[in-house]
Amino acid sequence: MVLLFGAATLIALALQTMLPYWLPIGPYVPDLVLILAVDLGLRHHGAIAALMAFVMGYAIDAFSGTQIGLNAFMITLVFLLTYEMSSRLLVTNVVVGILAVFAGVLIKDLGSIAISSGFGGLGQRGLMADLFGQAAITALIAPLVFLALARSKKLLGLLTPGRREDNTPARRWLK
């Protein structure tokens, strides 16, 4: 599992870095690493998953060159909130994942802005429109990333029967 999410994080970081050069999408670059953190929070509970979320956030910090630790903190916070939400719900399906990704992007970006530039930067109307646009695009891409992760886990034999991520016929409600 660690190697799968490590490779997925590197691919996500490469795509997030290159997408603005390939496509004219401006500020609407999907946050693929956050989708991975939400998947960790929904389906993998334990200290290793929390450590992986922190390392994924720290990798964003290393690639972006911004304040070291800010993205690590925000990605870990989104992971913990998603973990708490999934432990309280009976069913964690794609719709719950999409909503968690949308809220996670808003929490991460608003928290990063509030910490790095103070709360005065949150009142700009154009900024809020861009944040909601990025959250919507990231939420729309989330099911594809969840599907790719589930197929990769199945291909590598990482699914254990009876777990939340198991999609056997006896557990059809998870689709």
Predicted stretch roles:
Residues 1-175:
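Terminal, non-globular segments
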